[in-house]
Amino acid sequence: HALHVHHGLSRNADDWLGFCTRLCQEWNVPFRSVKVEVKKDGLGIEAAARKARYQAFSDDPSGIIALAHHQDDQIETFMLAAVRGGGIKALAAMPPWRKLDEETQIWRPLLTFSRKELESYAAACNLPNIEDESNADTAFLRNWMRYEALPVWRERIPNFDRHVCANIRSLQTD
């Protein structure tokens, strides 16, 4: 089934819920939505939303939650870990499989595909999608990394993505 976590943070949040509801009805996919309260509790808004979202995942009875993180997300996570610290575990970024709790596993099947590859596939297959407008806000460090820093690294260093991903794989297996 599909699970939509409604954070209520964007003025478009209700529209996203409607989009997911209609798409799942059209594709005959069982659908469930969970509205969460994002409590900052000393966290930034992104971290607080992630905490609420993962709690909703943990409460879902499906056992396996598949997420759409892709290679670009993985590279951003690695680079952010490099500048924030956190050691080897943080630099290993996101594993393809991770135990969330005793009953729930997180699965990231798209980590080997770039955002561009996924966008091309979606366009070729006429798959509808939505984009969270907050992803364009470079006030968030991850977005600044995505739109400002990483393009410079990619221009300067041949095969940058391939090298970073090789390091991530090495860190995950060590």
For each feature predicted by the language model, list its residue ranges:
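ATP/NTP-dependent adenylation/nucleotidyl-transfer catalytic domains that generate, transfer
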Residues: A139-D174
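Core alpha/beta nucleotide-donor-binding catalytic domains of modification enzymes
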Residues: H1-E148
